[in-house]
Amino acid sequence: MKILICNDDGYQASGIIALYEALKIVADVEVVAPEQNNSAKSNALTLHSPMYVQTAANGFRYINGTPADCVHIALTGLLGYRPDLVVSGINNGANMGDDTIYSGTVGAAMEGYLFGIPSIAFSQTEKGWAHIDVAARRARELVEQLMPSLEVVAEGAQPALAPWLLNVNIPNLPDDQIQGVKVARLGRRHAAERVITQTSPRGETMYWIGGAGPAKEAGEGTDFYATSQKFVSITPLHVDLTDHERLPYWEQAAARLTQAH
């Protein structure tokens, strides 16, 4: 099995190194990742400046672009083959609830999904790499569980669920404190904290985006709740942003506008 690994923290981050070391035991693994930290770049693609691919001493390839750029370039020419799985991470910090909209980690996995390849975004819920070895081992265990279905896809017999996109958050805890795995829906956060302003040495006002807001929908069944109870959370995602519940309302509103003319 062939796996493409990306991330948004950059090719030198501890999370992607640990993930590579864990997955190379069970698959042929290739790393194509951003040169620099690209957190919160979502699905952004670079369209107005050139990008370059370089190779690090450990064989990782890195690009002066976004996480989605890296996956896009890898899949459209750099690799020369189609991987069976795209994996992104392990991110330094959670990607739960509304985080998934902004996350470069999720954006990289989503790019793989958009190309019809099963994809997984892995994140560790608390910043810092205290238990990154645990997170990497848990990530490998999940991939191993999914291998039979991935092999079916590779042989050309597409199961009904393929492709799929999973968002996985792993508690930053010792292995014996993790309670298991729960499939959960996305929770929600309050709006981001107030923008931070500072004055530059030249007297100019500088602005920094405030921190993520606290959880506001974090009840049972959400990713926030699962990880708070020391479970690994797994959330299946898709890219359909249609508000299906309100479609009938807007159809009626459009009909009234049509009648008015």
Swiss-Prot record:
InterPro entries, per database record: SurE, SurE-like_Pase/nucleotidase, SurE-like_sf
Cofactor binding comment, as recorded: Binds 1 divalent metal cation per subunit.
Keywords: Cytoplasm, Hydrolase, Metal-binding, Nucleotide-binding
Location of this chain's protein in the cell: Cytoplasm
Listed EC numbers: 3.1.3.5
Major localization class: cytoplasm
Residues annotated for a divalent metal cation binding in this entry: D8, D9, S39, N91
The protein's required cofactors: a divalent metal cation
GO cellular component: cytoplasm
UniProt entry tagged with the keyword Cytoplasm: yes
Keyword hit for Phosphoprotein: no
Function text: Nucleotidase that shows phosphatase activity on nucleoside 5'-monophosphates.
Name of the protein in question: 5'-nucleotidase SurE
Species of origin: Polaromonas sp. (strain JS666 / ATCC BAA-500)
